[in-house]
């Protein structure tokens, strides 16, 4: 079961990257379509604001569960969990732009919404690095569990097949 959970975690990191790229694409398409008075831009932005964050949240929760079941190191569990507060910050940073009259103090600071893009870039960087870090961590984990005797035997076996 833990091997299956590790595979789910490993493939989930790539899926998260695809979802985040989809979020960037939807945001750009939605903004530029809306600026061009294309009504389809509103639907694309609706995906960006509802379906995309929901997919990131659900995938993060699945990854946290997979990390626990797979008995992965805490660092790997924390990486999966890191997307949740970053997602929460995304929602907070857009408030001054989307709802300027609801919270007058924040409405006077529309520049604060620029942090929405900065945070999105950090989320993208994290999602981009995550599969690489996961591959490295899983390789180190399997080497530690294999023990020194098995690691010494593998090069000898490889030399015999040459």
Residue spans for each PLM region:
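Polytopic transmembrane helical bundles with strong interfacial aromatic enrichment
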Residues: 1-162
């Amino acid at each position: 079961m833990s091997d299956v959970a590790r595979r789910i975690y490993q493939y989930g990191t790539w899926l998260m990257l695809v979802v985040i790229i989809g979020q960037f694409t939807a945001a750009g398409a939605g903004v530029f379509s809306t600026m061009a008075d294309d009504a389809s831009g509103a639907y694309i932005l609706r995906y960006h604001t509802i379906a995309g964050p929901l997919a990131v949240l659900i995938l993060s929760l699945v990854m946290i569960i997979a990390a626990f079941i797979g008995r992965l190191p805490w660092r790997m569990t924390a990486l999966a969990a890191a997307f949740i507060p970053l997602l929460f910050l995304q929602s907070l940073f857009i408030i001054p732009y989307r709802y300027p009259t609801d919270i007058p103090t924040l409405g006077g600071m529309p520049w604060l919404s620029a942090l929405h893009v900065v945070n999105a870039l950090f989320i993208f960087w994290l999602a981009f690095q995550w599969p690489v870090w996961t591959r490295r961590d899983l390789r180190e984990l399997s080497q530690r569990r294999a023990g020194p005797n098995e690691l010494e035997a593998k090069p000898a076996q490889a030399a015999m097949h040459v």
